[in-house]
Curated annotation (Swiss-Prot):
This is E3 ubiquitin-protein ligase ipaH9.8. The record marks R166, F187 as: Sensor for substrate-binding. Changing F395R: Reduced autoinhibition in absence of substrate. Effector E3 ubiquitin ligase that interferes with host's ubiquitination pathway and modulates the acute inflammatory responses, thus facilitating bacterial colonization within the host cell. Interacts with IKBKG (NEMO) and TNIP1 (ABIN-1), a ubiquitin-binding adapter protein, which results in TNIP1-dependent 'Lys-27'-linked polyubiquitination of IKBKG. Consequently, polyubiquitinated IKBKG undergoes proteasome-dependent degradation, which perturbs NF-kappa-B activation during bacterial infection. Mediates polyubiquitination of host U2AF1, leading to its proteasomal degradation. Residues 251-545 are annotated as: E3 ubiquitin-protein ligase catalytic domain. Autoubiquitinated (in vitro). Ubiquitinated in the presence of host E1 ubiquitin-activating enzyme, E2 ubiquitin-conjugating enzyme and ubiquitin. Its EC number is 2.3.2.27. Changing H219A: Does not affect autoinhibition in absence of substrate. Changing E338A: Does not affect E3 ubiquitin ligase activity. Belongs to the LRR-containing bacterial E3 ligase family. Changing I196A: Does not affect autoinhibition in absence of substrate. Disruption phenotype: In murine lung infection model, mutants cause severe inflammatory responses, with increased pro-inflammatory cytokine production levels. Colonization is greatly reduced. It comes from the Bacteria.
Length: 545
């Protein structure tokens, strides 16, 4: 390898004169470009990297995060990877024909040059592109999300992954599959697409198309649902949402959104309190969430719903930690349909109860804590069931599936945190048989797994630390003694039995398993002891609802 001086002020000897002569045109153009730097640009660093790349004949050139407003016209001809992301570029020069990977995300590009014929990866998300040039047949992956693109050129047959979220696309491209074995995943979420072309059915059933948050026509959704529900359907899996993607991005002040849930005689005091939280993270989206929550079927039809929300908001105003958690949970809820808001409300109520349990609300009411734990366990199992159901559907809005199991089983499984109504159950794909099977599975797993689950539940541990400090300390001492005396040998025995001694990944996995088994044994014993003391009149309460 040729010796390199970082500032590339080449010594005057015959060896370096030869190099300098070979690259004279490049060096001269780059030096001139460097002298034209605008304030804040790191063109000196860019030129250093350019010269190093050229002299070393490197196939990668990385000029990202240098605040560059332009690039020199003559890039090294041999490069296969160019990274110029996170700059201030408004255009790109002619690209080397050898280029296979182009990274130019988070710039200000309004157009792209002709793309090299061997290009395999194009990453130009977060720019100002309005259209794309012809795409080379070699292209495998492309990310054009967060641009202003209205239509797409023909997609190469080789393209496996396309991300075109948050553009202005009004239609999907034509899909031609034939016998092509490529497994594709294409994302067109949050565009302006109203119709789905029949050519989408040409894709294989291993492919996935994401079209959530688009204004799909009233005819497109039921037609696709009928088609994809057919036993003969062998097309791609299509992810959609009941949202039209047109949510209002204007948020009224947080205090105004909060006070709307309270009686008029309380609004002045509430407004004064909540004004102090206007600038907390996610405050704007939380405001929008509250407004959308007021328009759900539960808010319109459920008696006492407004009072329930007001009481919850009072608790948030008194706890910065709970408020921070709740703002974060609600952050994305305004970007989807009404049922997404309802599901978020379920999650917010769970967050409140778990927070209260951890903070001591149930320290003197073990029976109530058990009931809460049982509900959290049931919801966890329902999420597993919903996740499995999603995998079986070809045309699916995941939010509707998750909410359907919670809403439709809320009464039978005594789910106090679940809304009792949802708007779009009909598109969830969840059948009456699914619900019967889910209820039976929850009860079976609860009978067999709840005791162990509860003994490891964080809020229960918080209660034990506060109210059974001596017993908790003894359990922790027992755990650390095991770690010191038994843990290494148990891990070694497990690795030996599986023939994986010396495998670092297997050792980590075996260690985690041994630790969990140990904690399960110790905390289960502690749990049984404490519950026997606190609930002597109902020793079976842990095992039955």
């Amino acid at each position: 390898m040729l010796p390199i001086n970082n500032n590339f002020s080449l010594p005057q000897n015959s060896f370096y004169n030869t190099i300098s002569g070979t690259y004279a045109d490049y060096f001269s153009a780059w030096d001139k470009w460097e002298k034209q730097a605008l304030p804040g640009e790191e063109r000196d660093e860019a030129v250093s990297r350019l010269k190093e790349c050229l002299i070393n004949n490197s196939d990668e050139l990385r000029l990202d995060r240098l605040n560059l407003s332009s690039l020199p016209d003559n890039l090294p001809a041999q490069i296969t990877l160019l990274n110029v992301s996170y700059n201030q570029l408004t255009n790109l020069p002619e690209l080397p024909v050898t280029l296979k990977k182009l990274y130019s995300a988070s710039n200000k590009l309004s157009e792209l040059p002709v793309l090299p014929p061997a290009l395999e990866s194009l990453q130009v998300q977060h720019n100002e592109l309005e259209n794309l040039p012809a795409l080379p047949d070699s292209l495998l992956t492309m990310n054009i999300s967060y641009n202003e693109i209205v239509s797409l050129p023909s997609l190469p047959q080789a393209l496996k992954n396309l991300r075109a979220t948050r553009n202005f696309l009004t239609e999907l491209p034509a899909f031609s599959e034939g016998n092509n074995p490529v497994v594709r995943e294409y994302f067109f979420d949050r565009n302006q697409i109203s119709h789905i072309p029949e050519s989408i059915l040409n894709l294989r059933n291993e492919c996935s198309i994401h079209i959530s948050d688009n204004p799909l026509s009233s005819h497109a959704l039921p037609a696709l649902q009928r088609l994809t529900s057919s036993p003969d359907y062998h097309g791609p899996r299509i992810y959609f949402s009941m949202s039209d993607g047109q949510q209002n991005t204007l948020h009224r002040p947080l205090a105004d959104a909060v006070t709307a849930w309270f009686p008029e005689n309380k609004q002045s005091d509430v407004s004064q309190i909540w004004h102090a939280f206007e600038h907390e993270e996610h405050a704007n989206t939380f405001s929008a969430f509250l407004d959308r929550l007021s328009d759900t079927v539960s808010a319109r039809n459920t008696s006492g719903f407004r009072e329930q929300v007001a009481a919850w908001l009072e608790k948030l105003s008194a706890s910065a930690e709970l408020r921070q958690q709740s703002f974060a949970v609600a952050a994305d809820a305004t970007e989807s349909c009404e049922d997404r808001v309802a599901l978020t409300w379920n999650n917010l109520r769970k967050t409140l109860l778990v927070h209260q349990a951890s903070e001591g609300l149930f320290d003197n009411d073990t029976g109530a804590l058990l009931s809460l734990g049982r509900e959290m366990f049931r919801l966890e199992i329902l999420e597993d069931i919903a996740r499995d159901k999603v995998r079986t559907l070809h045309f699916v809005d995941e939010i509707e599936v998750y909410l359907a199991f919670q809403t439709m089983l809320a009464e039978k499984l005594q789910l106090s945190t679940a809304v009792k109504e949802m708007r779009f159950y009909g598109v969830s794909g969840v059948t009456a048989n699914d619900l019967r099977t889910a209820e039976a599975m929850v009860r079976s797993r609860e009978e067999n797994e709840f005791t162990d689950w509860f003994s490891l539940w964080g809020p229960w541990h918080a209660v034990l630390k506060r109210t059974e400090a001596d017993r908790w300390a003894q359990a922790e001492e027992q755990k650390y003694e095991m770690l010191e005396n038994e843990y290494p040998q148990r891990v070694a025995d497990r690795l030996k039995a599986s023939g994986l001694s010396g495998d670092a990944d297997a050792e980590r996995e075996a260690g985690a398993q041994v630790m969990r088994e140990t904690e399960q044994q110790i905390y289960r014993q502690l749990t049984d002891e404490v519950l026997a003391l606190r609930l002597p009149e109902n020793g079976s309460q842990l095992h039955h609802s």
